[in-house]
């Protein structure tokens, strides 16, 4: 998963196909587990654009999307965020969310 800027996320979000943006903070233990789960999903869905960003560096995004906590996975297409995932639960759950 590559680190994305806010601009890179907005560009990916404009596309017709699904894109995901993973928001984390480095001191978050749950984020470390979520990162590992998303890495597996990324291998299973190589065509899906998935980026990540340290929310500490793009705080304006937290306000813009009303992020309540980290980890948070923003999922969207065609300029719209269609889902915000906070409870990652399992690799299978993330796969089911992102395979569409």
Where would I find each of the regions flagged by the language model?
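Short acidic-hydrophobic, aromatic-tinged amphipathic segments that line or gate anion-handling sites
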Residues: 1-9
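Thiol-based oxidoreductase modules, predominantly thioredoxin-like and allied folds used
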Residues: 3-4, 23, 42, 46-60
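Local sequence-structure signature of Cys/Sec-based thiol-disulfide redox active-site neighborhoods
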Residues: 8-41
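Short hydrophobic/charged patches on amphipathic alpha-helices used for structural packing
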Residues: 10, 59-62
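Chalcogenol-based redox active-site neighborhoods
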Residues: 64-65, 91
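Structural micro-motif
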Residues: 65-74
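Non-catalytic, surface beta->alpha helical segment in thiol-disulfide oxidoreductase systems
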Residues: 74-100
């Amino acid at each position: 998963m590559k680190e994305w800027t806010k601009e890179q996320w907005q560009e990916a979000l404009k596309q017709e196909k699904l894109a995901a943006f993973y928001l984390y903070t480095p001191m978050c233990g749950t984020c470390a587990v979520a990162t590992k789960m998303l890495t597996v999903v990324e291998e299973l869905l190589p065509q899906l654009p998935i980026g990540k960003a340290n929310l500490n560096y793009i705080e304006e995004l937290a306000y813009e999307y009303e992020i309540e906590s980290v980890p948070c996975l923003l999922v969207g297409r065609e300029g719209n965020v269609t889902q915000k995932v906070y409870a990652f639960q399992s690799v299978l759950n993330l796969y089911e969310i992102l395979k569409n």
